[in-house]
Amino acid sequence: MVKGPGLYTEIGKKARDLLYKDHNSDQKFSITTFSPAGVAITSTGTKKGDLLLGDVAFQSRRKNITTDLKVCTDSTFLITATVDEAAPGLRSIFSFKVPDQNSGKVELQYLHEYAGISTSMGLTQNPTVNFSGVIGSNVLAVGTDVSFDTKSGNFTKINAGLSFTKEDLIASLTVNDKGDLLNASYYHIVNPLFNTAVGAEVSHKLSSKDSTITVGTQHSLDPLTSVKARVNSAGIASALIQHEWKPKSFFTISGEVDTKSIDKSAKVGLALALKP
């Protein structure tokens, strides 16, 4: 595997995962099984308030080609084909949704020791073209992420980011929404033995002068059980406990409360993921 700056989406990812991953206020259940031919079948059901959503996903691997098919309750089909290492460091992704005739997209990703590039284009008459690139190393990296609408001739997205990584910390700064939104994040490993880490994110919108500060932490109570907590400057506090009761199978309980309106009911989320 190439060690380098990675793709643009990885800038600030460690802090985002610590602060937001697995926190939810829904009830979610998923189970994965394997057919005799080796096809992975994952059934997922989610309850959002009074709304019930579900999908069934099929994944097949043949050498360096992975094919995914997802069938959703809204009668749509999402098909994705991924080809890894067609050339050293290159990944090709082709996807489309049925019956949406304008959903086709092709994406190319290339990872190098000193660069990470991703480009995608919609398979339509006037597609939107996206390009993201990162240069640097696994210590210091700088990159950009832009989208161009060929129909209007305008840039619909212009983002830029910077990341600094050491053994126990990662700091990043991104400028999004064409320079209107600034995000700074920090991730620090406090105790590797117990997977203890802290993270923080500061967001500032220049047009409205609104700022949000979010801080959080994670800690492993034992090799199979971990806890996470976060709070932001708006007074929203969240916490979760996750237990791996068998390999690759997780049970997660999460909660969220508005500390400025304690008369409101707390939001509680449950998630169960079963894998053989």
Curated annotation (Swiss-Prot):
Gene Ontology terms for molecular function: porin activity; voltage-gated monoatomic anion channel activity
Compartments, record wording: Mitochondrion outer membrane
Source organism, top-level taxon: Eukaryota
Chief site of localization: mitochondrion
One GO cellular component term: plasma membrane
Reported consequences of knocking out the gene: In vdac1-6 homozygous plants, normal growth, but small siliques and decreased pollen germination rate and tube length.
Gene Ontology terms: biological process: defense response; response to bacterium
Keywords noted in UniProt: Ion transport, Membrane, Mitochondrion, Mitochondrion outer membrane, Plant defense, Porin, Transmembrane, Transmembrane beta strand, Transport
Induction details: By the bacterial pathogen P.syringae pv. tomato.
Expression (tissue specificity): Expressed in shoot meristems, root meristematic zone, lateral roots, leaves, stigma and anthers.
Record remark: domains: Consists mainly of membrane-spanning sided beta-sheets.
Protein role: Forms a channel through the mitochondrial outer membrane that allows diffusion of small hydrophilic molecules. The channel adopts an open conformation at low or zero membrane potential and a closed conformation at potentials above 30-40 mV. The open state has a weak anion selectivity whereas the closed state is cation-selective. Involved in plant development at reproductive stage, is important for pollen development and may regulate hydrogen peroxide generation during disease resistance.
Xref: PANTHER family: MITOCHONDRIAL OUTER MEMBRANE PROTEIN PORIN 1 (PTHR11743:SF60), VOLTAGE-DEPENDENT ANION-SELECTIVE CHANNEL (PTHR11743)
Family from the record: Belongs to the eukaryotic mitochondrial porin (TC 1.B.8.1) family.
Protein name as it appears in the record: Mitochondrial outer membrane protein porin 1
Gene that specifies this protein: VDAC1
